[in-house]
Amino acid sequence: MAKIIGIDLGTTNSVVAVMEGGEPKVIANEEGGRTTPSVVGFTKSGERLVGQVAKRQAITNPENTIYSIKRFMGRRQNEVNDEMKMVPYKVKQQGDHIVVEAQGKDYTAPEVSAMILQKLKKAAEDYLGTSVTEAVITVPAYFNDAQRQATKDAGKIAGLDVKRIVNEPTAAALAYGLDKKKDETIAVYDFGGGTFDISILEVGEGVIEVKSTNGDTHLGGDNLDQKIVDWLIDEFKKDEGLDLRAKGNEMALQRLKDAAERAKIELSTALETEINLPFITADATGPKHLVKKLTRAKLEQLVEDILQRSIEPCKKAMADAGVDASKIDEVVLVGGQTRMPRIQEIVKQLFGKEPHRGVNPDEVVAIGAAVQAGVLAGEVKDLLLLDVTPLTLSIETLGGVATPMIPRNTTIPTKKTETFSTAGDSQTEVEVHVLQGERPMAGQNRTLGKFKLSGIPPAPRGVPQIEVTFDIDANGILNVTAKDTATGKDQKITITSSSGLSKEEVERMAKEAEAHSAEDKAKRDEIEARNQLDNLVYNIEKMLKENGDKVSGEEKAEVETALADAKKTLEGTPTAEELNAAREKLTASSHKLAEAMYKANAAAGAAPAGEPAPGEPQAEQKKDDGVIDAEYVDVDEKK
């Protein structure tokens, strides 16, 4: 049976895992890393780089290197004004969705995420030795419907059938609770690169039930990095009188971001670090260098207001779950940012206990996704996951009021039907306006979709009976139906295009991604064939130089012609097939050369006339000269 992989598609890093022999296993990427930076770079030559190689060239190519794309998934421009200021690449609105620009071409957020997913998919295929077409992908628990749908679209573009979207804290609980026999109430505190989530769950006896979830999709490690960058810029301006925010300093800003992230990571274990950036900029007096010491205490002072933003969602989640901190048995930390000592202190103060450190915060979400994939594939038995919807789902009623249909933290899948009526006399159609959010008025919440139910028989207001049904599946994807009970007419909407991409656009992008994947393979094949031919040319030239005098002019000329042809091929832009053909031709010539050399060597080794033939006493005596006695060792016995 084909494997279903589990993917943690993160803001900063992504991880892929799979169930093997009943155990979840994290799969290393092509570079050997267990985590893959969620970075995509576009070079001038049209090459697309993903992961560590993309991250490495970000400093010299900041405007065409896309990172933290998860912050733009399923979002509109007015929702990401702060995020847009944090990145060096261009972000703009295009229709209903956001696009980023790289090398003059526009890409949607799901398209860029799909490039990261393709790399993880390939790593899994290389490891498993078979094609992979199905996956479970995780999202922050507080992702809304549009963000979830954008994630599913990214999977589809990457050639993956997304069998389930799982909340990240829930996935962490799956990994944590896999072997738990006793009942426990756990809190999963997930502070990632771009989002913050808190979930309260009950774990035990093969059942993992989410009681509540809360969070902030504008809060993450990126915000801490930005605080350090802002501090460095202000300090540099104070010292040198130069503003690194000025236009033309894009490369310097990228260097600052990289240095800020490194310093933040170092200060999780060290008390002080030095940020040293030579030649950060220059003025009329010459080059300028940035050298600054940053202590852990100063870092904590800089970011304290950001860290405090994680406390209120935790309190709300506990209130919604009907528990207080004393009832929480374990606090599981997720996300690399939770290695920061100050975050661990905040968690300890909030929940009154030391956080659990038995899981790897970078890998636990992908491991949980692999466990859920194992459940869907039938590899993991006796494990039931009961998740919740993170935000209230409502419809707009008279006066612009948001009337809740499914409250937040309702266990999913779920279905709810309510009866509504018309607001005016002789009204023949009603508009159903579907909303998501916690605000009392429709205009303050996010629109998921609108549709009209027409053909209602004219009647006084309040008489027609319109049944509205909200149905959420296990992925948190919503279907809404409105039905006139008198006529039986109904209208249905599946909130699936809320990522801003139509089905046709997703399919087009999937085809483009597939074509690009084929291009990538052709490029890899071409590089491999080029390297093989280049090596062969080098070796034959060396052999000809050392042994050219031992073969006839005709044989030598034939090889030199083949060498010239091979070099000419290498100078152009040949395909892998053309390179392989040149290599085969050169190999055939080299075989003839080798054969001629062996013959020449054999002839040179024949005994000259008048000397004793081999086997005669003198020859035997000569052969024995310089022989050293040694003990015989049977190598096999040593094995």
UniProtKB/Swiss-Prot annotation:
Record's compositionally biased regions (Acidic residues): 627-639
Family to which the UniProt record says this protein belongs: Belongs to the heat shock protein 70 family.
* Low complexity compositional bias, start-end: 601-618
Phosphothreonine-modified residues are where? 195
Q: Which Pfam families match?
A: HSP70
The record's annotation in SUPFAM superfamilies points to: Actin-like ATPase domain, Heat shock protein 70kD (HSP70), C-terminal subdomain, Heat shock protein 70kD (HSP70), peptide-binding domain
- Is-annotated flag, keyword Phosphoprotein? yes
The record's PROSITE patterns line, in alphabetical order, gives: HSP70_1, HSP70_2, HSP70_3
Q: What induces it?
A: By stress conditions e.g. heat shock.
Q: Which UniProt keywords apply?
A: ATP-binding, Chaperone, Nucleotide-binding, Phosphoprotein, Stress response
The record ties this protein, via HAMAP family, to: DnaK
Tell me one GO molecular function of this protein.
ATP-dependent protein folding chaperone
Q: What is this protein called?
A: Chaperone protein DnaK
Physiological role:
Acts as a chaperone.
Disordered: region residues = 601-639
InterPro entries recorded for this chain? ATPase_NBD, Chaperone_DnaK, Heat_shock_70_CS, HSP70_C_sf, HSP70_peptide-bd_sf, Hsp_70_fam
